[in-house]
C-alpha cells in the first residue's frame, strides 16, 4: 500500500484540471472516512425510509389541498409562493412524481446520527463520484465503488438528458461538467449535456435534471418553455417542480400531534418510530395567537415572542429559513441561537415572525456531533496531521423502481470548534467506507 504522502500526491494528480467547484478548496485525507461496519444496514435502509417519508409528504400535501387532510398543512407549505407555481405543482400529470436523488445531511452522534435536513437540490454528485473514483483507484473499498454514483445518476435519466443549471448555482457547474464527461464515456449510446437555465431550450423526449432553485424562476426567462413541455408530457424533470416538497418545515409537521396517526399509517409503525429517533424536534415560528390555556409543545411558552427572552442555555437551537428563499439552501439562512448575542437573537425571532407569511422560519433542536479523528495533509508544512472534528455525512441514494439505492457517501469533517457543519476551506472532504473503527 502506498504511504500517506504518496496517496495524497496521487489524489492531487488525479484532480480534474477544470476543477470541481468554482473557487472552493478543502483539505485532502489519504484515506476514506470510516463508518463502523455495524452501521452498514442502517445506512443502506435509510434511503428507503426517506423515500417512503417523501412519498407520505407528497400525499399529505395533496390531500390537504383537496380538503381530505387539515387545510392548514397546504397553507403552511404554500406560504410565500406565487399562485401560478402552486397551481403548476398540483398538476395531475406530476401527482406521483418524487425526487429521484435523496441526500440527507446526517450529523454523526454517539447514538448514530440525526438528520439535519434533506437537501432538495443536492450538489456534490460530481464531487462524490470523483472522490469515489480517485480513492478506489488507490485500493479503497468506498461506499458505492468506483462507478456507483455514475451508474445511479444514469438510472434516473435512462434516456440521457440535460443537467440544467442556473447562474445562481454556478459554483457547482464544474462538477456537473465533469460528471457529464464521465457519463458520456461510460454510456456513449446516450447524450449528456450541461445547459444554462437562463436560456434553456427544451427538446421533446430529452429529460432534465434540475439544478436550479424554484425561488430563482423569475430570473430564468426561458424556463416557461421547459415547464410547458413538462406539462404536455414531452419530457420529465427531476427533482420535480414541487416547491412544497422542498420545505424544511416537514420536520415540524412530522412531530405535530394532529398528524401523528397519518404519519404512523403511511410510514408504518416501524419506519415511524425509526424516524422519530433521527428527525430532530422542530417548530414552525407561526405568530398566530394561541388560546389562553395552550402552550407551544416542549418549550412551554404561550407566545413565540417569549422565546426572544430565552437564556443562552435555552437558545441551544437552530433557526432556519424553511425554503423558497435565497436563504433557504446551504448554510446561508441557518444560525445557532446559543452563539448569538441576546440582541441579535431577539432580532432574528422578531424578523422571523414578521416575515412568516412570505418566508417562514423553523426552530430545530441542535445536536452536537461526535468527535472523530481523521488524517489530512497539511500542504503548508508538507506533513500528515490528524484533525479531531465533527462529521456531516451526506449519503446519496438514487431512486430506482421505488427503491432507494445507496451509491456513495460524502463525509465533511469540520474542526471541533465548528458547530455548523458544512464545506469550508479548513474542512476535510472525503468519500466514506465501511470498516471496523476504534471509538474516538
Can you annotate each of these PLM segments?
Residues 1-440:
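Preference for protein termini
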Amino acid at each position: 500500500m502506498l504511504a500517506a504522502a504518496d496517496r495524497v500526491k496521487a489524489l492531487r494528480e488525479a484532480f480534474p484540471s477544470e476543477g470541481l467547484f468554482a473557487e472552493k478548496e478543502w483539505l485532502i485525507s489519504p484515506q476514506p472516512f470510516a463508518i463502523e461496519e455495524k452501521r452498514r444496514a442502517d445506512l443502506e435502509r435509510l434511503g428507503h425510509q426517506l423515500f417512503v417519508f417523501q412519498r407520505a409528504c407528497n400525499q399529505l400535501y395533496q390531500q390537504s389541498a383537496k380538503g381530505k387532510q387539515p387545510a392548514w398543512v397546504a397553507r403552511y407549505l404554500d406560504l410565500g409562493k406565487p399562485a401560478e407555481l402552486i397551481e403548476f405543482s398540483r398538476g395531475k400529470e406530476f401527482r406521483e412524481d418524487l425526487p429521484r436523488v435523496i441526500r440527507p445531511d446526517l450529523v454523526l452522534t454517539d447514538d448514530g446520527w440525526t438528520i439535519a435536513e434533506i437537501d432538495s437540490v443536492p450538489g456534490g454528485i460530481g464531487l462524490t463520484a470523483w472522490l469515489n473514483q480517485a480513492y478506489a483507484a488507490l485500493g479503497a473499498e468506498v461506499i458505492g465503488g468506483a462507478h456507483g454514483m455514475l451508474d445511479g445518476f444514469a438510472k434516473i435519466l435512462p434516456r440521457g438528458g440535460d443537467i440544467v443549471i442556473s447562474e445562481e448555482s454556478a459554483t457547482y457547474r464544474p462538477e456537473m461538467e465533469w460528471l457529464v464527461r464521465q457519463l458520456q464515456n461510460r454510456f456513449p449510446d446516450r447524450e449528456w449535456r450541461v445547459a444554462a437555465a437562463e436560456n434553456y431550450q427544451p427538446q421533446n423526449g430529452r429529460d432534465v435534471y434540475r439544478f436550479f432553485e424554484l425561488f430563482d424562476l423569475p430570473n430564468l426567462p426561458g424556463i416557461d418553455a421547459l415547464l410547458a413541455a413538462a406539462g404536455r408530457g414531452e419530457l420529465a424533470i427531476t427533482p420535480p417542480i414541487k416547491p412544497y416538497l422542498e420545505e424544511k418545515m416537514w420536520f415540524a409537521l412530522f412531530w405535530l400531534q394532529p398528524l401523528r396517526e397519518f404519519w404512523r399509517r403511511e410510514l408504518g409503525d416501524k419506519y415511524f418510530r425509526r424516524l422519530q429517533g433521527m428527525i430532530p424536534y422542530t417548530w414552525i415560528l407561526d405568530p398566530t395567537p394561541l388560546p389562553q390555556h395552550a402552550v407551544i409543545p416542549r418549550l412551554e411558552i404561550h407566545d413565540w415572542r417569549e422565546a426572544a427572552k430565552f437564556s443562552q442555555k435555552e437558545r441551544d437551537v437552530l433557526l432556519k429559513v424553511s425554503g423558497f428563499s435565497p436563504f433557504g439552501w446551504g448554510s446561508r439562512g441557518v444560525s445557532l441561537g446559543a452563539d448569538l448575542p441576546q440582541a441579535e437573537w431577539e432580532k432574528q425571532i422578531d424578523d422571523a415572525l414578521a416575515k412568516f407569511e412570505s418566508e417562514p422560519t423553523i426552530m430545530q433542536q441542535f445536536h452536537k456531533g461526535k468527535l472523530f479523528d481523521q488524517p489530512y495533509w497539511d500542504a503548508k508544512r508538507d506533513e500528515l496531521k490528524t484533525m479531531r472534528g465533527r462529521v456531516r455525512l451526506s449519503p446519496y441514494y438514487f431512486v430506482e423502481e421505488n427503491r432507494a439505492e445507496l451509491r456513495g457517501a460524502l463525509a465533511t469533517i469540520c474542526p471541533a470548534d465548528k458547530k455548523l457543519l458544512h464545506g469550508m476551506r479548513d474542512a476535510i472532504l472525503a468519500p466514506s467506507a465501511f470498516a471496523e473503527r476504534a471509538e474516538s
